[in-house]
Amino acid sequence: MKTKNIISLLLVLAMLMSVCACGSDTTPAAPNGSAETKPEYRITAKLTAADAENKELAAHLTENCVISFTNTSSDTWDKICLRDYAAANLELENSISDDKPYTPGSIREVKDSRGNALSFSVQEDKSVVYVQLPSPLKPGERTSVSIDYSTEIPCCFERLCWSPNGDDFAGENTVCLSQAYPVLAEYIDGKWNEAPYFTDGECFFWPCGGYEMTLSAPEDYMVISTGSEAQSADGTWTLKADNVRDFAVIAGNGFETVSYTHLRAH
């Protein structure tokens, strides 16, 4: 089992490394293409472990996600589009499973940078969510929204899942958190990207950005992610990645760590 878990951790690390790198309520922003125009995600999250003996009791994630973004188009935005891929993932999982249905990912509340509640609407495709901005966002202006969010994490083998018994990919009681948070959709040719979600292949895209997550996980869990990880004295994890399209997190208590020194000969 030790060898298997070491191999599993190496495979997970390879997957994470493969992720592509790429007043007023508003503020002026730098020219398009600069670091200041990219979306920034600041996520505070709590992961509750699942019961490995009862697959009906799913793992659960609650979080607050603050997205800072710039209108990089030539149009004025009165609303923005978010993609909630966790909701689409759970909706699809329910459609193919006879087990107890999972509760789809849910945006509880959206606020502007001043703490005022914003109206939002979930479309027929549950992954598409429109948020009404408090005032029109002109080209080049930057603002932020704060999102309270929660989702169950299904027992399956998907981008968002938990594995109770381990397999060739993940160790025992491993949680995979990919697309476990709302993201700003891509705005192209005067409209927001509403391409449908499906499990096979890469069906989604959104602007590259910076991510910082503060994650509270079960005490015995190891956490690895796209970018860097640091654990504080109180057990919380700080995870950071810059200029990436997707920010993935793997957590579990079945991993082993391996360290080595690489010597270069001349």
State the predicted function of each range:
Residues 87-96, 223:
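Short aromatic-acidic-glycine turn motif
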Residues 6-24:
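Sec-dependent N-terminal signal peptides of Gram-positive bacterial secreted proteins and lipoproteins
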Residues 22-63:
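N-terminal, polar/Ser/Thr-rich
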Residues 69-73:
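Asparagine-centered strand-capping/turn motif at beta-strand->loop junctions
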Residues 77-81:
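Ligand-binding face of N-terminal immunoglobulin V-set domains in extracellular IgSF glycoproteins
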Residues 261-266:
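Conserved small/polar residues in nucleotide/adenosyl-binding loops
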Residues 60, 98-168:
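A surface-exposed beta-strand-loop module
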Residues 148-250:
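Extended, low-hydrophobicity, Ser/Thr/Pro/Gly-biased non-transmembrane segments
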